[in-house]
């Protein structure tokens, strides 16, 4: 005895096919807001390390060598949870909708960004990433009283060449004390 | 390519070994058989016996109690064979690995400490389309080995 | 037993004072009306008998706190929900006792409550406590090399820090004694750990006589990850991502239980929109889990076509998840104090269209399950669990509701938006596999109606989706949170110690209580029915094998954690700095 329900469903699926043609056609459903592969925006990253602090499985690592700071996401450990996207102050990380990430070699599954650092002229140590200093200067100068703008710009150019320890040591020589702005 | 090699590549048989973990990757692998993604139209079949398989798919972190069983299954599959590791836990231990010095005592290690792996599919869990992409890469590798 | 629920707290306290006399040390109230009672350790069996006979209580779980040289504190959590009642806050009673560290022994209550067997086996293995009179004292979860090979460190180096008696040696798992010599017609059939019918790894041993099963035995522990110990090293906020990965099918339920317990610790109130969105995702997850289970069940019977139909209609639910949260499985929507993403106005019509498709399909499946001859022949009268057996073993969830035991945390202890929406609890009197199928399919229809009510509420209410949360929680607070997962009741117990890292987290999942009931149901059935009986309780082995914390502290001011030598050195430095 033939089952009537099975026949009815079979005719319905002949009329409208449910299967997608994936490797030979587009994937099924990729809405916006989907959490796929995380990608860095090279111009916006300031190298602050906020994403490194908040990553739950510790998939983000920071390495410093040769005057450059390199931030790396290990895609094999990443949970694709989008916490780094929420925490980043410059919106430099976005989770795109790419999901085809299979590789033959595990060391290729990573995403990196490199930021150069400023060298102190007195002691030679690398003390801060360069985009941080230039962004701070632009933001301070855009909101300050135009009367003080010129002095502050000149001072900024001198002070941003020394690390905080050397700035304290050479404070007399550089005329570095906050009261001169009052 | 001879007739034997052509038939092996055009219809690979897959053995699925669930090695613990949270089951997220397992339900995405079984969802590849359902009508929407339907891998059987590409010639792929799931078998229960390792003696009849070409590709071994491993998902889940591998706990200490299951390492012996996994090694035995790998040795029973006849050559040529390809191993695919699916999901964050199988690649690096994922969120169960611990931080700093501390490694969770229940972990037998990521899969490539126990058996050699050919294709890695990252994701937590990866979409069924990403798994199909990984299996397509595995079939490419099988073609070279035959 | 006829009594009213109005003065339950006072009645319990007065009866305990009468019976125990001097051994009763005091009581205090915790958050949301939970009651905590301190007693001396010799009276535990007496209290268990009294609570079972007079008040018809149900054991939720047993947990252990480790206080160093002060000793171990053992906690017994009870609930009182076997009676019918209207929407009132249900009482949870916790009985606490202290046992000394040099001689950790206590009476076992497995002869009164069978549901304590798994919990006591786990405690005795991981904390070193001896339960006198335990029914089944065999190996449970730890790896076989424990403690001789712990991260490659030799035991001789650690033995200076802890006395040898406290380190329990874990041998191999021994199956129950089988007397088949002299009876050549009996034999043993092992199923697992790798089996093509099961998606997870566990090991059943069936003692059979021809085709009939006489007895069954179960070994779990292949999925042990050490989760509760991992949770004690990270902050409250990072633990959400670990608790999400305890089980992939009920992941949102685990995070809601964890967040509910932490919110009870800190006295945090959720905003309205956050509550409705959380309830909406929770009911969607119940629909997806029941459809998944129905498909797997049909596959085990042999009706592969129905397996494909169920999973095809489940894809619409996963599309809604992807639209709202960004991922099909493991949607990280919860955070302490609210949710992370919002449901906007243009999403709502698309969601309602997909819900219409699922509702039409679900009604079709209910009709199919009641009239299709294949399903009825394979499931009616198979694997029966009577009402008395269900109460004795202590099952929860749809397994209990199919045996006429009406317990549901959403009705007994209302939370989120379940008090504001109207829905019914589904029960059936038979107790066989057919009743379990019908209960789950009818629950899908109830969940769809709750989802529609939540969407209507979301259209009218505005406001934020998260509340303000402190970074550290006060010292010495504890809380128990209970939540209804698709498989039953899920309980979390958290204790805080004044920092941003929790002191102790104890998880008790519903599969812990449901899995041993298969050993009752498998008697006198045939081998061919074994897979469908085992699958009818919806076993989730990922939920059953977690772990608890092991801290061995010596009285001589040296802290020890028997997992890594560098951790030992760090802890001893910390302790001497504190002293």
Task: Identify the residue ranges that each predicted region occupies.
Chain B
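Iron-sulfur-associated redox domains of electron-transfer enzymes in respiratory
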Residues: 1-146
